[in-house]
Amino acid sequence: MTLQKDFLRDNNLGLLLLRLTVGGLMLFHGLHKLFYGVGFIGGMLSQMGLPTWIAYGSLLGEVVASLMLIAGLWTRAAAIVFAGNMVVAILMAHIGQLFAIDPMTGGWVPELPMLYLMGGVVLFFTGGGRYALTRGGIAD
């Protein structure tokens, strides 16, 4: 067992780090909504003429799916819910800014939700890896 062969080239370790990072960071957003409510999202939905109860779906994508990603529990299924949640977030909050650059930072305005979205997409295609709770099933 060598450092380079067994550790530095371990794709499964990379998938674990991706799951922990994407799921862990999104969990903060979800817990904030869980403890303080989804009124902000409900207001955005109301302005779009949509029912406000749909805002509770963000808890599914930001709390439940994030915890599943962290644990590696049905990773592919969790990742598609997670990514779908981010598509909705981008469409609701950034649809008018898809081609905008932040003048203060020079960054793309929707870059953070896009990073979360792509993290979910990658995990959907790869699965959770060897260090996941569930492995080998269609939802894993």
What do the PLM-derived regions correspond to, one by one?
Residues M1-H32, W53-L60, V64-D140:
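Extended, low-polarity transmembrane helix blocks
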Residues F35-G49:
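Membrane-interface interhelical connector segments
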